[in-house]
């Protein structure tokens, strides 16, 4: 009722309140979804069904490692999650970075690559991203991620420090741009120029999100003033944490367009309207004007005892 009143104050008129709320919905035989980032997690399952993304069990990976087989294990999660728990021998490489940095992380095309997360979604999305980009290595998702590893009776590494990601040289950057262009053409993803983007951002009738999908370090070195920092892998995994307005425009930016394109590919498949900015974010000036990724600079602090009396 409070939300309905607030929406009415904002000028909305076609409003209704669900009689009985969620309990009544469930009592009527409809489904209630539980958990976090549910749309993204459901999407991961659909991707596996659609593409038949290959995977392997924890026992199989463990056997490969014990037999001394050459295999690269890449953890597609955030730095914080990697520190909390990781597969022994695994290397930190967030999902959006996989296609961008894989040539620097594997010795040759004959080396199998296993992508893991804590459960399923990012393992599947990360592996399928590499497959969709056409890498010739054997690409596999680790079934059930670190959870599956632990349930199989194997120990995890806790407190691991994420390895610094390798930086591409000029030749690798050029190759990345070519790969991005090929993906844009193949998937018919839309691009947008800076002038049009500014028009969209000034439009008070429709929300536009500009998301910088690079690493935090790159973002801090320089970014477009209006850009939110939203690492591409996490933006796909937890879209609802960045995009609050339905049918909003989503514009993604990076340096070579590869990370933006792979992220856009999945966001569009999820039903979002998404564009890739055709400008190089690495050439943007360092600015303190945009602190959108740090809400503490935008909102006043509120002590717990003050919150409790409101």
What is each model feature region?
Residues 1-72, 76-209, 213-310:
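Rhodanese-like catalytic fold shared by cysteine-dependent sulfurtransferases
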């Amino acid at each position: 009722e409070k939300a309905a009143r607030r929406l009415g104050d904002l000028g909305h008129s076609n409003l209704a309140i669900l009689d009985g709320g969620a309990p009544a919905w469930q009592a009527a035989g409809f489904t209630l979804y539980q958990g976090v980032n549910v749309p993204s997690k459901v999407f991961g399952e659909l991707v596996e069904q659609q593409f038949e993304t290959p995977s392997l069990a924890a026992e199989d990976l463990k056997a490969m490692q014990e037999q001394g087989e050459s295999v690269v294990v890449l953890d597609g999660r955030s730095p914080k999650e990697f520190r909390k728990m990781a597969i022994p021998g695994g290397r930190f490489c967030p999902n959006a970075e996989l296609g961008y940095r894989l040539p620097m992380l594997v010795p040759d095309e004959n080396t199998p690559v296993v992508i893991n997360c804590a459960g399923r979604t990012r393992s599947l999305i990360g592996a399928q991203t590499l497959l969709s980009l056409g890498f010739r290595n054997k690409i596999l998702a680790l079934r059930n991620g670190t959870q599956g590893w632990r349930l199989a009776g194997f120990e995890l590494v806790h407190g691991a420090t994420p390895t610094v990601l390798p930086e591409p040289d000029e030749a690798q950057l050029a190759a990345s741009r070519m790969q991005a262009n090929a993906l844009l053409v193949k998937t018919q993803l839309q691009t947008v120029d800076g002038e049009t983007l500014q028009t969209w951002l000034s439009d008070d009738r429709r929300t536009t999100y500009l998301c910088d999908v690079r690493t935090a370090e790159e973002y801090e070195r320089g970014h477009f003033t209006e850009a939110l920092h939203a690492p591409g892998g996490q933006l796909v995994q937890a879209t609802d944490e960045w995009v609050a307005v339905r049918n909003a425009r989503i514009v993604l930016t990076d340096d070579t367009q590869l990370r933006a394109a792979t992220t856009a590919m999945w966001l569009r498949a999820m039903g979002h309207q998404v564009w890739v900015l055709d400008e190089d974010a690495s050439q943007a000036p360092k600015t303190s004007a945009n602190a959108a990724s740090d809400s503490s600079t935008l909102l006043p602090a509120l002590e717990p005892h003050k919150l409790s009396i409101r």
